C-alpha cells in the first residue's frame, strides 16, 4: 500500500514519505489481517514477546495496535492520510484533498493489489476490500471487514 500511495499525489505536492505511510497504515493492516486466525495468532505472539499483556488474542491484537498508534503519536506521525501534512506532521487537512483521494482510489487499490509485497500478505484483499482498507487509512476509521 505504501508503495502505491507514496507518489500517487505528487502532483499536489503530497509525496507521502514511505516510512510515514508504513507507520500510518500498519495498525489498519494488522486489524485487517487479524481477521485471519493464523495471522491473529502471530500478532498475539508478537504482543506477548513485547510484553503488552492481554488475555485473549483479540485483546493482544488490540494492545499491539494501540502500541503502534501511541508510537506514531510519540513520533508525531498522523493516524491517517487525511491529516498528513508538511514533513509528516499531523494537520487538520493534509496534502491529499479528499476528492482527489476518492477519485484515484480505484486505481491505487488495483495497483496495491498487484504490488509484489501484497502477495506475501497473510490475507489477500479483493479490490473492494483494498478500497475499504485505503479509506480506513485515509479517514482513520475502524477496520470492520
PLM features per residue range, with description:
Residues 2-4:
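Acidic catalytic cores of enzymes that act on phosphate-bearing nucleotides/polynucleotides
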Residues 10-104, 119:
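Gly/Pro-rich interdomain helix-loop hinge
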Residues 99-145:
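Short, amphipathic C-terminal "tail helix"
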Amino acid at each position: 500500500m505504501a508503495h502505491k500511495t507514496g507518489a500517487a499525489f505528487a502532483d499536489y505536492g503530497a509525496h507521502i514519505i514511505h516510512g510515514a505511510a508504513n507507520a500510518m497504515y500498519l495498525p489498519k493492516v494488522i486489524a485487517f489481517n487479524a481477521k485471519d486466525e493464523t495471522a491473529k495468532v502471530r500478532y498475539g505472539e508478537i504482543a506477548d514477546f513485547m510484553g503488552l499483556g492481554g488475555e485473549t488474542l483479540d485483546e493482544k491484537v488490540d494492545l499491539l495496535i494501540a502500541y503502534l498508534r501511541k508510537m506514531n503519536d510519540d513520533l508525531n506521525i498522523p493516524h491517517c492520510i487525511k491529516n498528513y501534512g508538511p514533513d509528516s506532521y499531523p494537520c487538520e487537512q493534509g496534502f491529499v484533498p479528499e476528492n482527489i483521494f476518492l477519485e484515484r482510489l480505484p486505481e491505487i487499490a488495483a495497483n496495491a493489489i498487484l504490488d509484489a509485497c501484497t502477495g506475501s500478505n497473510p490475507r489477500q484483499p479483493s479490490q473492494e476490500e483494498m478500497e475499504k482498507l485505503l479509506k480506513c487509512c485515509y479517514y482513520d476509521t475502524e477496520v470492520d471487514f
